[in-house]
From Swiss-Prot:
Name recorded for this polypeptide: Uncharacterized protein DDB_G0286299
Compositional bias annotation for Low complexity: 9-22, 232-244, 341-355, 393-425
Record-annotated membrane-spanning stretches: none
Annotated Basic and acidic residues bias: 73-99, 163-192, 199-210, 217-230, 284-303, 311-340, 356-383, 441-451
Start-end of Polar residues biased regions: 44-54
Amino acid sequence: MSETENKTTTETPTTTDSTVTTKEVKVPKATSKGNDDYFFVKNVKNQLSNTRTRATVDRLAPTPPLSQAAKRKLIDTKERKEKKEKKEKEPKEPKEPKEKAKKKAKTEKKKDDGDEEEDEEKEEDEEQKEEQSQEEDSEESEEEQNSDEDKKKKKKQAKKVAKKETEPKKKEAKPKKEAKPKKETTKKEKEATTTSSDSTEKKEKEEKPKKEKKISKKDQAAAEKKKDGDDSTTTTATATTTTDDSTENKEEKKDKKTTKKPAAAEKKKVKKDGDDDETAAAATEEKKDEEKSEEKEKKETKKPAAPKKPAAAEKKKTAANPTDKKDGENKDVTPSDDKPAATTTTTTAAAATTTEEPKEKITKPAADKKKAPANKKAEKDQSSSDESANKETTTATTTTTNKDATAPTTTTNKDATAPTTTTTKDNVDEASVKKTANSAPKKEAAKNKSK
């Protein structure tokens, strides 16, 4: 193991004595770093080094020479200490009570105030004396000036008098200018000037209230809104004006219609008057002519009705488009190519039912007649589009095939039992519709056979 050696360490105590005390401390000798003794020795050395304080080090170290600044500081500190000691040694005067000190201060202030007032009075007296002396001086100077001015004026007047006496009168009386005669204004000129001035005044007056009215209208509208709380009053006024206009237009139309009178009534009137039969006949003929002319004028004013298409064109249309249906019919019908075309039969409910019931004449109002040309264009466009569709799909017809071939007749319309009336816009005959409906399946059968 490790051997122990006795080592002596010197420590300086914190006391003022210069003697150094020694202590004997046993420190183990460390042989290798791996042993625990090595760390123990290290810790002991650290402890010994920490035991020395700053004071002991300063005492042992030699003192350096002082600088001049340090010497001055030392001198100043010494002088201050001496002054303090002297003050402490001197006997202190007893302090007066606070009340007495206050009274003394007040009396001193009063004395000072009194002295100041006396000084102010003296200054005021001196100022007044100076002002009086200045006024007296100014009066004397004014009097002197006035006397000098009077003397000068007198001298000037004397000179003027001497000149007048010596110099003759050279100035002659000049003839006065004759006053030009004023132009006499005629009555027309006066009226023109008055009218122009009046017109300008009127314009100015009219312009001013216009500007005020613009502002006043806005103010009135705002006031009305505040009073009523709603804008209903303003809207009703506009509505009433529009209705009045419409009623006036209607009354004018009624008056035009009521102007016509029947010829029979006119004949009776003529006979009542007691005129001859010839005169009555002539009067009735004239009135008839007038009525005819009026009717012609009305017809010219009205828009011309749409020209009717011929029945042949309609037949071509229906033959090309046998699948055109109304709103009530079923449009989605799928053709079947499984069975031969001999067993297929088509029945159009519209064509069958129209033969049983009589025709119904539908009188269209004037508004529909006006719309006729617009509808015509739409129909033409539809027909052209339908024809192109039928060219592409030739098999899409209203036909149904019977698989057993025992019941050849089948209906495609769900509402076939209900009687339906067809009203064509172009007044096409129903017979042509029937023919086209019957001819369509025959054509299809021929096509299927050829295939």
